[in-house]
C-alpha cells in the first residue's frame, strides 16, 4: 500500500485532519532541506510536499517564486531533489513525500526514468500544476506502472465533467485550490470557501485538502473544521527565509509555525 493511503487511513482511524507543509527543495540553501523535512515531521506534518525548482512557476505567488529563484541559484534540479528524498528516507520510511512542480523539468528528465528514480528514492506521488487531467494519460500510465500517485488540483470553478475525469484518474487525495490567482493570495472568505468546498467534496471520491491562502494557525483550524486537511506553503517559506536572513534558526521558526498549526487543528475536536 502506498504511504499516502496508509497515512490517510491512520488519520481517519484517529479522527484527525491532515496537515501538509510545502517547502521548495534547496531553499534557502541545499544543505538545509533534509533537516527541514525532518523538523516538519517532528512538528506535526502528516505529508510533505517538496517543490521542484522551476524558472517559470506560473501558479506561484512572489514568496514561492523567490524561493525557486534562490534554489535555482544553487543549481538545484530533479536529480538533486531526488537525492534529498533519498537522504530523508534513511531515517524516515513512513512519512509520504509528494513532489510538486511543473511538467517541463520532468519531461526533460524522461517520464519513465523519472518515475523509476522517484519511486526508488522514496517519492510517493506528484502534483504537476500545469498538467490537467485530460492531458495526463501518458504520464498517468507511466506513474501507474511504477506505483507513483498522481494528485490533481480542483477548484471552485472545476466543472462536474472534469471532476468525473479526475475521479477516474486521481490517487490519494485532491489538492483543493481555495483561491483564484496564485499561492500566497489574499485572505480567505470562509463562508464562501466552505460552501464551494462542500460542493466539490460531494463530487469527489477522494479526500480534499485545502491549499492556497492558509497563513495562520487560526485560519488552519477554521478550514479544518470542514475540510479533510490543510496545506501550508507561502506562510511557512516566509518564516524560513525571515529567520535565515535575520541569522536565526530556520528549523526552529518553521517548527514553531507548524506545531502551532497542528495544535490548532487538533483542538477543533473530532472530524466532521
Swiss-Prot record:
GO terms for cellular component: cytosol. Pathway: Amino-acid biosynthesis; L-tryptophan biosynthesis; L-tryptophan from chorismate: step 5/5. Keywords: Amino-acid biosynthesis, Aromatic amino acid biosynthesis, Lyase, Tryptophan biosynthesis. InterPro entries: Aldolase_TIM, RibuloseP-bd_barrel, Trp_synthase_alpha_AS, Trp_synthase_suA. It catalyses: (1S,2R)-1-C-(indol-3-yl)glycerol 3-phosphate + L-serine = D-glyceraldehyde 3-phosphate + L-tryptophan + H2O. The active site is at 49 (proton acceptor), 60 (proton acceptor). CDD domains: Tryptophan_synthase_alpha. It is an enzyme of class 4 (lyase). It holds the Pfam family Trp_syntA. Its EC number is 4.2.1.20. GO terms for molecular function: tryptophan synthase activity. PANTHER family: TRYPTOPHAN SYNTHASE ALPHA CHAIN, CHLOROPLASTIC (PTHR43406:SF1), TRYPTOPHAN SYNTHASE, ALPHA CHAIN (PTHR43406). Tetramer of two alpha and two beta chains. The alpha subunit is responsible for the aldol cleavage of indoleglycerol phosphate to indole and glyceraldehyde 3-phosphate. Belongs to the TrpA family. This is Tryptophan synthase alpha chain. It comes from Legionella pneumophila (strain Lens).
